[in-house]
From Swiss-Prot:
It is an enzyme of class 5 (isomerase). Substrate binds at residues 173, 184, 191, 205-208, 218, 282. Homopentamer. NCBIfam families: heptose_epim, PRK11150.1. This is ADP-L-glycero-D-manno-heptose-6-epimerase.
Length: 319
């Protein structure tokens, strides 16, 4: 069985979709459906089983071998987390993102099960120079980023003793289908689309940190491309480590807004004051250093903002 934690969430459900496209349906989704709206991400997918994340964690900790699943667990894609960068309940974040990840990690390395997990570019924080997979370049701005940083550090300490595949992927700004349940944490493309559909102009922040209005830049990566990287590592088990998962290109938020406007053929960008609560806690620039990912042989192409947002708009506004 293939296990996808967070499988009803944004990246997890897209990963299940790509696995289905490869003919794999022996998939167990692990998630927390307290927010029942996430079920819509699964209705067009084929899976073998679903399990609540708390039950799964309890069975993992107890050393359960999941004999009801044929041949046990083949791989764990660990996409489940509290991904809200605005969540400041540190106890909750550390339990869900750090402790849970450690439990899965130890279960996998003890049984030599491939373990591919979601890290985050939030570990880099407000740096605007080096986005290289090295602790000296990490300075997270929020407790979410810290929880991801700490788990990366934990994995790095264990790596010399591990005989099976362990891969951490530092996701940059991911956008695309099946993120509607994320509310305020959904991508800028999602929110701008909603604004234009409601007859409003798409709104971007005024300039800050030396960037012009709408000119703050991020490494935006389409969710399909993120899933392809995950699956490539699983198919290349000789590679382990922590890798950036971005495009290597920083593009301004203005490019996202222009792609949304182009799809709808209406609207003009409006600039709004930069929120006080984000000052000093905002990444005005991110750009993945792709040296390590390319160095292990990943040669897939990444959509530009214009290409990816066009695909996403077609999906969001389908009849």
């Amino acid at each position: 069985m293939i296990v996808v934690t967070g499988g009803a969430g944004f990246i997890g459900s897209n990963l299940v979709k790509q696995l289905n496209a490869q003919g794999r349906t022996d998939i167990v989704v692990i998630d927390d459906l307290t927010d029942g709206t996430k079920f819509v991400n699964l209705v067009d997918l084929t899976i073998a089983d679903y399990m609540d994340k708390d039950e799964f964690q309890a069975r993992i900790v107890s050393g359960d071998e999941f004999e009801e699943w044929d041949d046990g667990i083949e791989v764990i894609f660990h996409e489940g987390a509290c991904s809200a960068t605005t969540e400041w309940n540190g106890k909750f974040i550390m339990e869900v993102n750090y402790e849970y990840s450690k439990d899965l990690f130890h279960y996998c390395i003890e049984r030599e099960i491939p373990f591919i997990y979601a890290s985050s570019a939030a570990t880099y924080g407000g740096r605007n120079d080096n986005f290289i997979e090295d602790p000296k370049f990490e300075q997270p701005l929020n407790v979410y980023g810290y929880s991801k940083q700490l788990f990366d550090q934990y994995v790095r300490r264990w790596m010399p003793e591990i005989n099976s595949q362990v891969v951490g992927l530092k996701y940059f700004n991911v956008y695309g289908p099946r993120e509607q349940h994320k509310g305020s944490m959904a991508s800028v493309a999602f929110h701008l689309n909603t604004q234009v559909k409601q007859g409003d102009n798409p709104k971007l922040f005024e300039g800050c940190d030396g960037f012009p209005d709408g000119g703050q830049m991020r490494d935006f990566i389409y969710v399909d491309d993120v899933c392809k990287v995950n699956l490539w590592f699983w198919q290349n088990p000789q590679h382990s480590g922590i890798f950036n998962c971005g495009t290597g290109r920083a593009e301004p938020f203005q490019n996202v807004a222009e792609a949304v406007i182009k799809h709808h053929q209406q609207g003009a960008i409006e600039y709004i004051p930069f929120p006080d609560h984000l000052k000093g806690r905002y990444q005005s620039f991110t750009q993945a250093d792709m040296t390590r990912l390319r160095g292990v042989g990943y040669d897939g192409e990444f959509k530009t903002v214009a290409e990816g947002v066009a695909d996403y708009m077609a999906w969001l506004n389908r009849a």
